[in-house]
Amino acid sequence: PTTRPAPTIRPVPGERAFMHTPVMVREILALLAIRPDGTYVDGTVGGGGHARAILERLGPRGFLLALDRDTNAIAMAREALAAWSAQCCFEQGNFADLKPLAERHGLQAVDGVLLDLGMSSLQVDQAERGFSFMQDGPLDMRMDLKQATTAAHLVASLGEEALAEII
């Protein structure tokens, strides 16, 4: 496969860094029923909006494992949630690998898992990521920028039937 370098997303000088405004935060927190000493996983941390809401409700013995496939999202969330660094660990990875990622942090059980599925505005707003429907950009569409295969490679190398199955 053609390997493209991973784009690095940085705020434009003078602009605020990306901050995720979570949707349905009250409903999500009610469903998670956050306990101050609980252990939680945000499997799609993105910009950290939902994670912040969880961390604000945790006590000193509470813990959050924050995961994301997107290395840029992990870096931004780590910065946005630095005040909770004693209670929050970050891992670049796929939530499908939750068990080994959790075990790496000594977690055998958790009290709740949040998965906010889909693209984030972090990806859509950056034309170079290839997800934008408002700006021209390369046909990339990788959630995990460490992956070599881009959407352009798939379109060029797969047949119509295989592409239809993906879509």
What are these regions (language model features)?
Residues 1-4, 9-167:
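S-adenosyl-L-methionine-dependent methyltransferase catalytic core, i.e., the SAM/SAH-binding region
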